[in-house]
Amino acid sequence: MGQKVHPKGLRIGIVKDWDTRWYADKRNFSDLLVEDVKIRKYIKKTLYAAGISRIEIERAGGRIRIIVHTAKPGMVIGRQGQGIAELQNQLAQMTGKQISLDVKEIRLPELDAQLVAESIAQQLEKRMSHRRAMKQAIQRAMRLGAQGVRIIVSGRIGGAEIARSERAWEGTVPLHTLRADIDYGFAEADTTFGKIGVKVWIYAGEAAQKAAAGDRRERGERRERGGRRGGRGRGQGGQRMSREERAALERAAIEAGPKPVNREGGQ
């Protein structure tokens, strides 16, 4: 049977980065690695309803910086910052180190593979049809700009005696293209018939194309800000010149240019 390599692990150093960034010698490496696993499990369990997609961990000396990517930052921060302060204190007691906790919002959770997988798993736990849950997730992702989505649900689907896998997909998901920005997520649904696994792949386009689109968007925003201020490159009063005005200026520049010299007359 064909097995698929993890899309994130295959693309680390190309279009993906490590979620854990620190260095340790052989004596301390295993202890710090186990500590990272405990931190991630604790945050995920405590804030599961907040839609936690990724948890990045950075270490420097005796300090730990944790970056939580969530779809609901308000649930993590809490009222007047009480939630994040309490979580920070609990992690400090668990690790015995100074903790710095940052929260980053996921603006489009429908395009985050981990959050999509968890959403489908929650719907399966509520006995919703797996085909309907997969179809709705794919439609939302494609409507928001995804170029391809693939979903696999495996287990005793619908309480069947024999486990099976069902797939749904739309668009393209080029798993062999290393420059492709493919997000992957996995979640499990705990049902009365046992666990049902949910795997989600979302293809958001090639990394170079996304970077170019971001640059074009930034240039457009700068032009709009310049237009509101009456910036350079515009006509009188900061207004954009029309096509006719630009053509008239070009004709005037051509007519005012240097005239050809008559070499036969010696002039």
Curated annotation (Swiss-Prot):
Gene3D superfamilies: 3.30.300.20, Ribosomal protein S3, C-terminal domain (3.30.1140.32). The keyword Protein transport does not apply. GO terms for biological process: translation. SMART domains: KH. Residues 213-224 have a biased composition (Basic and acidic residues). GO terms for cellular component: cytosolic small ribosomal subunit. PROSITE patterns: KH_TYPE_2, RIBOSOMAL_S3. Keywords: Ribonucleoprotein, Ribosomal protein, RNA-binding, rRNA-binding. Residues 39-107 form the KH type-2 domain. One of its GO terms (molecular function) is mRNA binding. Residues 212-246 are annotated as: Disordered. CDD domains: KH-II_30S_S3 (cd02412). It comes from the Bacteria. The keyword RNA-binding applies. Part of the 30S ribosomal subunit. Forms a tight complex with proteins S10 and S14. Belongs to the universal ribosomal protein uS3 family. Binds the lower part of the 30S subunit head. Binds mRNA in the 70S ribosome, positioning it for translation. This is Small ribosomal subunit protein uS3. It comes from Symbiobacterium thermophilum (strain DSM 24528 / JCM 14929 / IAM 14863 / T).
